[in-house]
């Protein structure tokens, strides 16, 4: 408990002393009385037990990080190429490889990364294209296609009235 009021500092550094006492921090640490001007402050004493995170930066600002990153990526690519490609597995083996918690998930981080930027499902989810059969025109539509604009309009009105309104009470059914 000799360094009760001090913060943990890296080797070779001196903790800043109390205000007005240049280098007074070591004076309190050397005295065995355990009294310091900050002895009533529990927060400071708790901070002395945990190390201060202010370590040395591992990467200089000269592009060395990029070099290390490229090397790491090349190593990962080599590891992927060296691994044997997964052959056809029996259904009981694939379930065991997937794990007990998630039956759809396959082992390894490579399988999840292979879906990034790609459509999932392949041809199963693609829309079917082709020739769509045309609907046969009814007799009314055939007659109105020959007539003038007024006849076309009246035929359309009849068509909507047939679906919407009842002639007996002139009301239309509720629309959900």
Curated annotation (Swiss-Prot):
pH dependence: Optimum pH is 6.5-12.
Known EC number: 3.1.13.-
Location of the region described as Disordered in the Swiss-Prot/TrEMBL record: 1-121
Activity modulation: Zn(2+) inhibits the RNase activity while Mg(2+), Ca(2+), Mn(2+), K(+), Na(+), EDTA and EGTA show little effect on the exoribonuclease activity.
Coiled coil: none
Compositional bias ranges of the Low complexity kind: 45-56, 90-101
Matches recorded under InterPro entries: TRIR
Secretion signal, residue range per the UniProt entry: none
Enzyme superclass (EC): hydrolase
Keywords, alphabetical: Acetylation, Exonuclease, Hydrolase, Nuclease, RNA-binding
Stated name of the protein: Telomerase RNA component interacting RNase
Organism: Homo sapiens
């Amino acid at each position: 408990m000799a360094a009760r009021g001090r913060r943990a500092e890296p080797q070779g550094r001196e903790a800043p002393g109390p205000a007005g006492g240049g280098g007074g921090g070591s004076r309190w640490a050397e005295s065995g009385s355990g009294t310091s001007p900050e002895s009533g402050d529990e927060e400071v004493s708790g901070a002395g037990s945990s190390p201060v995170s202010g370590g040395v930066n591992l990467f200089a600002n000269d592009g060395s990080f990029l070099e290390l990153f490229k090397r790491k990526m090349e190593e990962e690519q080599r590891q992927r190429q060296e691994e044997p490609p997964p052959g056809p597995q029996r259904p009981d083996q694939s379930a065991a490889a997937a794990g007990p918690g998630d039956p759809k998930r396959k082992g390894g981080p490579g399988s999840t990364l292979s879906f990034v930027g790609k459509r999932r499902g392949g041809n199963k989810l693609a829309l079917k294209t082709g020739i769509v059969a045309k609907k046969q025109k009814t007799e009314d539509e055939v007659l109105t296609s020959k007539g003038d604009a007024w006849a076309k309009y009246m035929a359309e009105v009849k068509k909507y009235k047939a679906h919407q309104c009842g002639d007996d009470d002139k009301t239309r059914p509720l629309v959900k």
